[in-house]
Regions:
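Conserved aromatic beta-strand anchor motif in extracellular beta-sandwich/beta-rich domains
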Residues: 70-74, 113
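Solvent-exposed serine/threonine-rich low-complexity stretches and specific carbohydrate-binding patches
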Residues: 79-89
């Protein structure tokens, strides 16, 4: 086989692998105050102090590509809607975080998780100024 033929076959294989990656599928949603190196949550919790950074890790099951978005809410009011375009070769975690330099108001919060614009899950958490 000539070098040109081998390179062409390698390119076709690579292109098929990328084109055949399916949509992302949710495995788990974690909320907490710290991350591991793989972007999963190392300190899972649903109770935060007003000055803490709040992390959410969206874990997907297998290779896939798409848009992962979160909708952070305080009560029913949407406070942020970040999104990330991702393309993973296998199971992975996509991280989002929220912080407020002036501190979060105490109360009930939630984060909705969307994959390609479709809500796939939600988590609730609370900010409490008396939490030690």
């Amino acid at each position: 086989m000539t070098l040109l033929v081998r390179m062409s076959l390698a390119m076709v294989t690579l292109c098929l692998g990328v084109a055949c990656s399916g949509p992302l599928q949710l495995a788990n949603i974690q909320v907490g105050r710290a991350l591991n190196q793989d972007r999963s949550i190392s300190s899972i919790t649903t109770l935060f102090k007003p000055n803490e950074t709040i992390y959410v890790s969206v874990q997907t099951t297998a290779a896939g590509k798409g848009t992962v978005s979160v909708k952070w809410k305080y009560g029913t009011r949407v406070i942020d809607e970040p999104s990330k375009q991702v393309n993973y070769d296998g199971p992975a975690s996509t991280e989002f975080h929220m912080q407020n330099s002036g501190g979060f108001p105490p109360g009930d919060y939630s984060v909705d998780v969307l994959i390609d614009g479709v809500q796939v899950g939600s988590r609730t958490f609370k900010v409490d100024r008396y939490f030690e």
